[in-house]
Regions:
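Catalytic cores of extracellular degradative/oxidative enzymes
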Residues: 37-40, 47-193
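Extended acidic/polar, glycine-enriched regions
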Residues: 1-45, 50
């Protein structure tokens, strides 16, 4: 539920019935989950866990996170990466009106190819795998591990002007984030993007 533009209503409480609570970790300016709250949140039985900040959002299977201990560190890394994307695009991070990127894995990728979207669903997962509640999936460890998400984000946000440019320039946000924000040397960041 979002408050309309220029309204100052702030957060509101709503009541829902007949729902199952899902784990939620929030690093939003107005709603930060504490470490103690996370210990309770991660045990909620909903099938998907939500991680959200002012710059990034993702949903992952609850089986990945019921023993996950580092949500704040993870979300700080994602925020740093999203700041890099915004900087590269020439947008001040504070001027974004929505999360820069929203990710979610799925069982099947439609049409067998990657694509842009909100959420971006470019990662597969196997629901029957025993993740022991502390998955080592890259989404929970290293926001720069997979270039695909940044490549598709580039398609969504960059305007290409020249023939052949479309599949090249979209790789630059990933190289920028890895080099400038995460300290990977430029040649490696560029080669792996």
């Amino acid at each position: 539920i979002e408050v309309p533009y220029l309204e100052t209503l702030g957060p509101r409480e709503i009541q829902l019935r007949g729902v199952i609570k899902a784990p939620l970790y929030s690093l939003r300016d107005f709603d930060k989950t504490t470490a103690e709250e996370w210990l309770t949140q991660r045990g909620h039985p909903g099938p998907w866990a939500d991680f959200v900040s002012d710059k990034f959002m993702m949903q992952v299977p609850t089986s990945w996170i019921y023993a996950f201990d580092e949500p704040e560190e993870l979300m700080n890394k994602w925020d740093l990466a999203m700041d890099g994307v915004s900087e590269y695009m020439g947008i001040l991070p504070k001027d974004r009106n929505k999360e820069v990127l929203y990710l979610q894995p799925d069982l099947h990728i439609r049409h067998g190819s990657f694509g842009i979207g909100y959420p971006q669903i470019n990662q597969l997962y196997e629901p029957n795998d025993d993740e022991t509640g502390n998955s080592d999936h890259w989404m929970l460890e290293d926001p720069t591990h997979d270039y695909v998400e940044y490549h598709e984000l580039g398609h969504a946000q960059l305007i290409t002007m020249f023939p052949g440019e479309g599949e090249a320039i979209v790789n630059f946000p990933h190289a920028y984030v890895r080099n400038v924000k995460f300290g990977v040397d430029f040649e490696t960041a560029f080669r792996e993007s």
